[in-house]
Amino acid sequence: MNRRSFLAASSSGVAAMSASAATAAAQPSGKTFLVAHGAWSAGWAWKKMHPLMAAAGHRLVTPTYTGLGEREHLASPSIDLETHIQDMLGVIKFEQLENFILIGHSYGGMVATGVADRVPERISRVIYLDAFVPKDGQAMVDLLGVDAAARVRQGVKNGDGWRVAPSAIPPDTSAEDAEWIHGLRLPQPLKTLETPVRLRHGDTKIPRSYVYYTRIGPGDPFHAFAARAKAEHWDYHELDASHSAHVTAPQPLMTLLHSIASA
């Protein structure tokens, strides 16, 4: 190779490297998402999201609360909301999670709110997915409303006396997914729904997003939280999905989560 050819090749190589670096710089860096799952559920319910997260360059961490899923053997009447908050804090500590996005789905909004209050310095954003958003001193039964809370407690009395049976799954769930979910969901300790969240630092200063699923089921309790999020000027989104979008609409949910993380 003569000198002119060498210089031309070198220039082309530098240009290609510069273009590659520019492309890489333009792409958002991967994020870590930690999921606080809903009632009766567990980490297994998010299995459709793992490959989608990986393909988008993100990491998804989906632990299971004490007494549910693969931790069923630890179930007891003493399990409460604080137990589940401590579960999540343990994962954050031992997985050494920093600058991560915390997701709370449904009941998981109760857990996520408590977690965000304890370790705000580790969390870059909280995303509530069709979730309860309590204020200090509120329990989930308070947010359900008097009639719904009474039905929950009556159902517990009619059952084993300490657990709440799973609710109906969304009607647009496929037969295959319905069989999968029915086979794995477990009753939830009532005390987790009766324990008020205690916020040591008041309303969080962490950026928050609320995603409201618009395929509304009967007795929808989440419209009030969506309205609050809009009134308080949160980052607000709506998704054409029923209550378990991670099961019934994983790709649209992934697209939205990636967009929120990249903003």
Predicted regions mapped to residue ranges:
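Conserved loop-alpha-helix segment in the C-terminal half of the alpha/beta-hydrolase fold
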Residues: 215-240
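Flexible "cap/lid" loop of the alpha/beta hydrolase fold
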Residues: 128-159, 221
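Conserved HGGG/HGGXW glycine-rich cap/lid loop of the alpha/beta-hydrolase fold
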Residues: 31-70
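N-terminal export signals
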Residues: 5-25
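Catalytic active-site module of serine/aspartate enzymes centered on a nucleophile-bearing elbow/loop
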Residues: 237, 241-263
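Active-site nucleophile elbow and catalytic-triad environment of alpha/beta-hydrolase enzymes
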Residues: 183-200
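Active-site loop/oxyanion-hole signature of alpha/beta-hydrolase fold enzymes
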Residues: 65-100, 117-118, 143-145
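Conserved hydrolase catalytic core segment
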Residues: 101-136
